[in-house]
Amino acid sequence: YTAIWHFADGEYEFSDKSFRVKTKSGVGIKMIHTLESTAVYRADEQHFQGFRCNEVPGVFWPLPTAECEKNGGNTRFVTIFEPSPDGEYNIESVEAGDAVDDDKILVSLKNGRTLRINEKDYFVED
């Protein structure tokens, strides 16, 4: 896979079984091209999960559904990708940004497949 995320701010961390972003607002990712959407991701042994809290600008939800909905948002859940049979994500490299778009993060996994975010902020896997 190659996965592309856009970060509003903060640091990113990767390990074999987890993906975490530390931002000024909390743990999460904000899609900068859709300012009214936020996204939070967590990993477990089953799959890599994505949550998006809509309609609550600028807020990150470490625990997605309940707090998001309590504050007037709605949460969309997506499974981004499954781990390999040994339970690891086989991350090969992480590349941060370029001169034109320095908030872009490219995550290359060893199986070579591609994951991207399309113009509507949905996740599309090639």
Q: What residue ranges belong to the model's regions?
A:
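CBM-like, beta-strand-rich accessory domains located in the C-terminal region of large
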Residues: 1-126
